[in-house]
Amino acid sequence: NLVLENLEKLGGFECKSYTILNAPKLKRIDEKLYIGVAASKVGSINAQEILNGLSSITYVGKDLRIDCSGIESFEPLRNLSFVGGDLIFDIGGSERNNLQSFTGFESLTTIGGRLIWGTGVSSAGSVSTYTSFSNIQSFQGFNNLSSIGGFRMSINYGDFSKFTSFAGLENLRQIKGDFTIEIEDSFWGLSDISALTNLETVEGSEFKIKGCYKLEDFTPLKQALTSYQGTFSTYSNG
């Protein structure tokens, strides 16, 4: 266990070996915050208990990376308003797929880096169909997010059939980098991106949507594409 009862600020924090964190006054982390990364190598870690101990966090200066295998709720991050680097969700194979939504990120307005989902690459038959995100249906919880530095979804395995829409991103106006979705899995449910109707700009050189076999309507991207100057590509979609 790690007790930091009076600490209000940290340079950076990489948590791989603690089961419980108590930091009730910690509001600011100027560098990276990694939670549960490489948890498979540290069997005793409880990523949810670590999140519970960070309930006062409002600011992460660089990357925030969360291994979601043991996460059941993001509610402890309800005060987080700014991430300066990437916000990375490492999605692993899991039979404990109790995570239902992104509730807890309602205060987050800006991600300076990319918003990233990723499963990594697996050998055939080596990973469970169920993942820590198998019950996620949309982006509900990110309802006040207005600006991100980039967007990347890279899915190589797992059941994401319940994830059907981008609902929750209605206030997203600006993506300062690339927008890429690359799906190499048949259990992918995304069919509705109407929440991106208000997206005004994508400033990166790549705008790509691949593997969304249920997605047929791209008109919600009309406003963003009007001003887009890079390469827009879609293939293996609906």
Where are the regions a protein language model picked out?
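Concave beta-strand-loop units of leucine-rich repeat
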Residues: 1-25, 30-53, 59-137, 141-216, ...
